[in-house]
């Protein structure tokens, strides 16, 4: 399965920011011409600001790299929108949203390749002190590498009012390369079976997802799912 051919350049560019310090400031000009400047000390805006900060660094090396739509997914495109990139930032413990659960399932049923293989995640860890953002670590991940599969639910997610709301990440240290797309598909299909959310025709959703996966990997994965227990048996021909 192919990924963005510029992945290595993007990863090295992002890694070069580890250790850097970023000051987010503001200047106000009043009607009388008086100005006032200061520093922004609010971690809630770091993610949005990082989009504007990161873009020119990558675009300098890759002229086909471009911003995505504001307040919508993805954060960046590459190669005439053929590849998608999502930016995630956190301090202390990852708590960002990967995607809305129902929305992600819907997108997978229509274009699994784009959401799983043509989208990658740029994940920055930072500290913020006195208005200064210090980038302390970075990882470039596939979606299946940032999910936890050993918790209360088949995949790590946020539950609100007994409904499964947003898909959430695992710990930063647990974002590792030995997780596989097959595990992600297996656990996701189990989640579709068990979710209390209203999803029309869960079995067809699962079949659509598995069919796309098999076509891309030329495999013959079968999922036997017990609708009462959510038990899953997976039989792939080969690992992705």
Task: Describe every region a protein language model picked out.
Residues 76-81:
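Active-site beta-strand termini and strand-to-loop segments that position acidic
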């Amino acid at each position: 399965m192919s990924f963005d051919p510029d992945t290595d350049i993007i990863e090295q560019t992002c890694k070069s920011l580890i250790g850097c310090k970023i000051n987010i400031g503001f200047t106000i000009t009043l009607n009388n011409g008086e100005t006032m400047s200061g520093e922004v000390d609010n971690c809630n805006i770091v993610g949005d600001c990082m989009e504007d900060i990161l873009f020119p660094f990558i675009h300098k090396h890759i002229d086909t790299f471009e911003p995505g739509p504001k307040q919508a997914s993805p954060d960046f495109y590459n190669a005439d929108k053929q590849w998608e990139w999502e930016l995630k930032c956190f301090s202390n413990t990852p708590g960002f949203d990967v995607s809305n659960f129902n929305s992600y399932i819907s997108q997978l049923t229509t274009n699994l390749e784009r959401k799983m293989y043509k989208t990658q995640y740029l994940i920055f860890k930072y500290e913020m002190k006195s208005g200064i953002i210090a980038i302390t670590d970075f990882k470039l991940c596939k979606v299946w590498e940032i999910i936890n599969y050993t918790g209360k639910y088949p995949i790590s997610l946020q539950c609100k009012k007994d409904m499964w709301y947003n898909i959430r990440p695992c710990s930063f240290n647990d974002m590792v390369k030995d997780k596989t797309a097959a595990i992600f598909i297996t656990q996701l299909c189990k989640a579709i079976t068990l979710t209390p959310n209203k999803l029309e025709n869960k079995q067809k959703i699962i079949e659509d997802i598995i069919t796309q996966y098999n076509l891309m990997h030329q495999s013959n994965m079968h999922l036997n799912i017990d609708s009462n227990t959510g038990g899953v048996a997976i039989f792939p021909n080969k690992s992705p």
